[in-house]
Amino acid sequence: MDPRERVPPGNSGEETVGEAFEWLETTLEHLNRVAVNHLPRELIFQVWQKSWAYWREEQGMSISYTKYRYLCLMQKAMFIHFAKGCGCLREGHGPGGWRSGPPPPPPPGLA
């Protein structure tokens, strides 16, 4: 038996760069919609703004790379939130948590 990881169906390496960018955009939009129900809006916007300031403006990385780094940070934040035993939807948020009102738009540059 070959111990190497098998390529899942549909991931033959023939995907285009455009499909990867589309995946990134879709994933970011979905993550932001979920995150707003679990993390303070201010935190979401600050993570985006700090990511943009550091990766895009200071380091000169591409917009896609900046979005990818933001995605990584937000995934870690959500993982920690859930690992601590998320009770947001069941018990509601405590101070500094979810704010009432309609969900905010995605961070600048992600719409």
From Swiss-Prot:
Region (Binds to human NUP153): 60-79
GO BP annotations, alphabetical order: symbiont-mediated suppression of host innate immune response; viral life cycle
Compartment(s) of residence: Virion; Host nucleus
Cellular component annotations (GO), alphabetically ordered: host cell nucleus; virion component
Motif (Nuclear localization signal): 64-71
Gene3D superfamilies associated with the record: 1.20.5.4730
Alphabetically ordered keywords of this record: AIDS, Host nucleus, Host-virus interaction, Inhibition of host innate immune response by virus, Viral immunoevasion, Virion
SS bond partners: none
Transmembrane regions listed in the UniProt entry: none
InterPro entries hit by this protein: Lentiviral_Vpx_assoc_factor, RetroV_VpR/X
Main location: virion
Family: Belongs to the lentivirus VPX protein family.
Subunit structure: Interacts with the P6 region of unprocessed GAG. Interacts with host VPRBP/DCAF1, leading to change substrate specificity of the CUL4A-DDB1 E3 ligase complex. Interacts with host NUP153.
Stated role: Plays a role in nuclear translocation of the viral pre-integration complex (PIC), thus is required for the virus to infect non-dividing cells. Targets specific host proteins for degradation by the 26S proteasome. Acts by associating with the cellular CUL4A-DDB1 E3 ligase complex through direct interaction with host VPRPB/DCAF-1. This change in the E3 ligase substrate specificity results in the degradation of host SAMHD1. In turn, SAMHD1 depletion allows viral replication in host myeloid cells by preventing SAMHD1-mediated hydrolysis of intracellular dNTPs necessary for reverse transcription.
Annotated protein name in UniProt: Protein Vpx
Organism: Human immunodeficiency virus type 2 subtype B (isolate EHO)
